[in-house]
Amino acid sequence: MKSIRIKGQNGDFSIADVGFGYSQILPVITKLWHTSYIINLYNSNNNFYSRLRFRELDKSIILMEQPELHLHPAMQAKVADAFIKTVDATRESETPSTLIIETHSQAIINRIGRRIREGKVSPDDVNVLLFQKDEKLQITMIKQIKFSNEGQLRNWPYGFFDPED
């Protein structure tokens, strides 16, 4: 019987013993790793026939819904770094990855902003779409919000992360 173990500063632990967040994020991290691995394998193989096997990798689009669920905010920030590393690992390839992430995580948004401020991510590579219900019209409006070069969200609605009283 096989088991998944998590290595930490205080030793190794079974995934069943470290909290629900690890088991929830494992498929996300596995998909990110697999995408980077397959694309790098594809790009490093100069054999024409071997490359034919991978031609469906013309563009890799990964969709994720609330990857932050059950994760500590510090771990959410690390997951954001994993998103950035996946895109970076495939950026120069013939098959770059695009990630579409639905999140309510301030930690993920803030980490992406920090990486932009540090120059590790271009603000042009990030799109934030905000879905807001218009109570008067009873429809949901979609607003595109961009990061500045300093990693700040432009025109972010007041009270989104800190609700008004």
State what each model feature region is.
Residues 1-157, 161-162:
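Switch/communication elements of ASCE P-loop NTPase nucleotide-binding domains
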